[in-house]
Amino acid sequence: MGNNTSKPSRKPQRRQHGRKAQSVQISGPSGGLQMIPTPQRDGSGRPLVHGSFEMNRDQLLIAFQYMAEYLHRQGVNLCIYVAGGAVNTIYLRSRHTTGDVDFFGANDKSRHLRDASKYAQQRSTCQLGANWFNNSMSLFLTRTIEQDLIAAARRQNAVLFSKPGLAVYAVPWEYALCGKTDRLTKSDRRPYDTSDAVAYLSQCIKGNRGRAIQAQQVEAWARKYNKAVSRSVLIEIDAAYKRSHGEHGIMF
């Protein structure tokens, strides 16, 4: 398990040295979910699209460290739950980099998280980008599913980072796997989606005492989490798993 432990690069990674840290003003009292980062529009009212930069494991952990220090100074200790490339990069180490950190949790303290993420962006010696830390996945979670995921993630206890001020947990592996089955059914699937699915399937199998997962079980998880799945996608994932592990990971 990692403690103090994607997306293809869209722009070359740029490092900035000797950059002076700027002060961040803490917002007023929190009042429910706030989007992170705060949505912005240009002069004509169109949403601004921020560039993204690839971050490696060390850079992500340093950014989390800055966030933890900031939150600890504010007297808060928050838990968040992360999906996607940050999990692969930090915990599973199945990717070298990721373009952002997708998370949910601590909705009532989201202003603190927003300010902490800005502080980390300012302190970091690498370019994180304005969208490096975002909770847009919260928009797609019902209250019931979110609470279920939080409880399951705490039981799973796959910790990406934990210091006074901030603890970061991976989402349940079955949820992560279903996120990839959903993506693989769509036309905008990405080159790394299948390998990500294999990494998550491997964790599901470990939790199943080393036994392959029944296809019906994956389909049940997908229904539970409102994710798409198809037999052809499961066959594709299983074939990729067999190539890398020498045995089937999904039973049909």
Question: What residues fall within each predicted segment?
Answer:
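Compositionally biased terminal segments of proteins
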Residues: 2-252
